[in-house]
């Protein structure tokens, strides 16, 4: 079994309701892997979360100083790097909060959650502690309605890591959505234990990270124009990916294009439930490639 596939299996075992705990160290075996995870068998890796916010500088400070991300650049692109994900920001005066759209929030995991909370308290960053599980809670970004779920895992090899993206389709759509992300992007369907309270959640795994699917309150709004405007996948070859999804009946909204002054290619599509998705090739800076 390849190193990448072993790491994926390790994460699945760790999160699955019937599995035993499993070390995450395999996924951190090289410095390069502390950024985007290795691509799956379809050449796809989780790439980024793109946020539309009124005050870009305040959110930049929130995701770096408060949450522990690292500011990096790829030509004209500014990214905030966490192991397994990039966060990107764009200025928008009137983006609605994520609540009520397909993507409600995304989650980070901390090696020492109490130390992180002490840092947030000292800096005046708003956060809460879970009523059922005090190891879990949310941290709230300034004035955008964005909340980041956080929890602690002392076995984490580094101080912080990406964990999940939480989508809230109508309950009747959960299985179809899970199957769609597996078919189009190569997610590995399964379940994980809830963190906030007892129970299980349907997921698609992307390496050791996951897309979590929970029932929303009816049909959710599309993400485009919300504070969590879209999510991103990074692929090894965007042109080949376009051909593969076209055979599945999935089309980009426009042909792939190269971002000026970079080697990064991008294209966009929307899933059947209103999630706006950017697909990139070579998003990571050379110093932060997987």
Ranges and model annotations:
Residues 1-14:
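N-terminal secretory signal peptides that target proteins for export/translocation
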Residues 19-29:
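Bacterial N-terminal signal peptides
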Residues 26, 33-41, 117, 121-169, ...:
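Vicinal oxygen chelate
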Residues 40-75, 79-82:
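Mature N-terminal segment immediately following signal peptide/propeptide cleavage
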Residues 46, 103-105, 164, 227-230:
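Eukaryotic phosphotyrosine signaling hubs
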Residues 50-55, 108-111, 167-174, 234-236:
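Short, surface-exposed ligand-recognition loops at beta-strand->loop->(often short) alpha-helix junctions
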Residues 54-70, 116-123, 172-189, 247-248:
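Amphipathic alpha-helical segments
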Residues 79-123:
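Mid-chain, structured segments of secreted extracytoplasmic proteins
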């Amino acid at each position: 079994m390849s190193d990448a596939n072993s790491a994926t299996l390790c994460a699945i075992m760790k999160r699955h309701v019937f599995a035993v705990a499993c070390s995450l160290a395999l996924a951190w075996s090289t410095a390069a892997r502390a950024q985007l995870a290795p691509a799956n068998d379809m050449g796809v890796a989780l790439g980024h979360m793109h946020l539309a916010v009124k005050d870009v500088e305040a959110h930049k400070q929130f995701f770096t100083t408060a949450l522990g991300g690292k500011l990096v650049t790829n030509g004209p692109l500014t990214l905030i790097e966490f192991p397994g994900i990039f966060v990107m920001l764009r200025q928008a005066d009137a983006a609605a909060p994520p609540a009520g759209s397909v993507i409600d929030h995304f989650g980070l995991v901390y090696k020492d959650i109490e130390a992180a909370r002490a840092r947030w308290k000292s800096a005046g960053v708003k956060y809460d502690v879970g009523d059922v599980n005090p190891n879990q809670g949310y941290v709230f970004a300034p004035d955008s309605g964005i909340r980041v779920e956080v929890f602690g895992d002392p076995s984490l090899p580094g101080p912080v890591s990406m964990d999940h993206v939480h989508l809230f389709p109508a309950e009747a759509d959960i299985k179809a959505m899970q199957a769609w992300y597996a078919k189009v992007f190569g997610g590995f369907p399964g379940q994980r234990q809830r963190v906030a309270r007892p129970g299980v959640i349907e997921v698609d795994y992307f390496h050791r990270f996951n897309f979590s699917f929970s029932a929303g309150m009816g049909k959710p709004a599309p993400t485009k124009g919300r504070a969590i405007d879209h999510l991103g996948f990074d692929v090894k070859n965007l042109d080949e990916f376009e051909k593969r999804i076209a055979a599945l009946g999935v089309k980009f909204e426009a042909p792939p294009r190269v971002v000026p002054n970079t080697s990064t290619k991008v294209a966009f599509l929307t899933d059947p439930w209103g999630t706006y998705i950017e697909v990139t090739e070579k998003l990571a800076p050379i110093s932060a490639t997987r």
